[in-house]
Amino acid sequence: MSGEQELGITESKEHSPGEWYAEVVQKAGLADYAPMGGFIVTRPRGYAIWERIQNNLDGWFKDTGVQNAYFPLFIPESYLEKEKDVVEGFDPEVAWVTHGGHNELEERLAVRPTSESIIAPFMAQWTRSHRDLPMRLNQWCSVVRWEATETKPFFRTKEFLWQEGHTAHADEDGAWEETMTRLDQYARLYEEVMAMPPLKGRKPPHDKFPGAHTTTTIETLMPDGKTVQAATSHYLGTSFGEAFDITYADADEEENTAHTTSWGLSWRAMGALIMTHSDDQGLVLPPALAPDQVVVVPIWQEDNKDEVIDYAADLAAELDEADVRVELDDREHRNPGFKYNEHELHGVPLRVEIGPHEVEDGEATLVHRPDGETETVDRDGIADTVTDHLDTVHAKLYASAEETLEGEIREAESREEILGTIGQHGGYVKCGWCGDEDCEEPIKDAIAAEIVMVPLDRDEEPIHEDCAICGEDAEETAYFAKSY
């Protein structure tokens, strides 16, 4: 993938979403393919978006007692084998180091697919008393899972960036509260920062994290009707505490096993963001994540060049002073039309156009990236005005995504209805489910759709009395969908 190609998107999001997505990632300067299959190079603009996701979450984590740490990339095989469910769950995806230079290692080292097995032993070492709990650790790192056969930047890569949080608690209540706190923070990220409506739920028992008691999930719907598992938060019970001897002495000096959690969000969130908001003109970004929130474009003739550029520069400086991320595009070798197209391609949420008329009248013309809405406003108070317009851009993006989601949740009462509805429309189909994994198989085999979540509330009544597949009594509501 090379960035030195024709400016502008040539593929259609509606008709060729896969090709369109790859072209947006390429031409908006987000990523390049690495020489090894399944790996990508994240370019500065793409990494800047990830940094803003990271900064928001990192602040919220720290506000709620989390400390950052870093653990080794390599995990001894014996450590990985201590939790048998983790071994069984990840074994096909683990990359192994067998040699150091020309010498064969005494013990194979796994390139971390996830870090429970290397973090838990140290949590055990650092936990002695109930006063040491809760212990809340997080690390920002990359992991490797040798599963991607077709590279799709930010969606399917063998190596990906993420954060993984790991906590230990004295009891189930504390650990479950932690699990839900992190799930709520992920939902907040999608709503307040990414302008995307999240669905919160649980994974069905057969699809929970290996070794977990309960896996909770954030699901987001893509325009092509597929869902993305956008973040997960796991209550691990005492399985890891028992496997790695994470114990503590309570107030009565009785030894107890700690309850643990883990939770994570990867750069798949970036893939979901790009897929949800972007269009046939290129990348569309919510203001909170845009590297440049505003671009100021002066439009001049030779006889008014200095006056127009000075006016635009003063306006840009005022926005910068107000902590708006702003770029002044006063390049002389590019015409205004080229600049407009380029900044639309790069996803800048708001464009400010300054020509001789704006200078003469003490105004500025604002153009919204998502829909091209244009408004001429007073120059006075421009920082407050621009901030209001950025809020409006976020609201537009959220409303559009919410409207799409609401129209893509349907119900079904039979296997045929599930197959027909997803086959025709995509999206989510809710139905009664008996809780048996076998009832998922005919849907998965026929159209590659599966149960992506069930309601968080275990006491919630199922949407229908009978299981849509086998006809037995329904235990809960299942959401079927195709997924990335």
Swiss-Prot record:
InterPro entries: aa-tRNA-synt_IIb, aa-tRNA-synth_II, aa-tRNA-synth_II/BPL/LPL, Anticodon-bd, Anticodon-bd_dom_sf, Pro-tRNA-ligase_IIa, Pro-tRNA-ligase_IIa_arc-type, Pro-tRNA_ligase_II_C. It is found in: Cytoplasm. Keywords: Aminoacyl-tRNA synthetase, ATP-binding, Cytoplasm, Ligase, Nucleotide-binding, Protein biosynthesis. One of its GO terms (biological process) is prolyl-tRNA aminoacylation. It comes from the Archaea. Signal peptide: none annotated. The keyword Ribosomal protein does not apply. GO terms for molecular function: ATP binding; proline-tRNA ligase activity. It is an enzyme of class 6 (ligase). GO terms for cellular component: aminoacyl-tRNA synthetase multienzyme complex; cytoplasm. Its EC number is 6.1.1.15. SMART domains: ProRS-C_1. It catalyses: tRNA(Pro) + L-proline + ATP = L-prolyl-tRNA(Pro) + AMP + diphosphate. Homodimer. Belongs to the class-II aminoacyl-tRNA synthetase family. ProS type 3 subfamily. Catalyzes the attachment of proline to tRNA(Pro) in a two-step reaction: proline is first activated by ATP to form Pro-AMP and then transferred to the acceptor end of tRNA(Pro). Consists of three domains: the N-terminal catalytic domain, the anticodon-binding domain and the C-terminal extension. This is Proline--tRNA ligase. The lineage of its organism: Archaea, Methanobacteriati, Methanobacteriota, Stenosarchaea group, Halobacteria. The gene is proS.
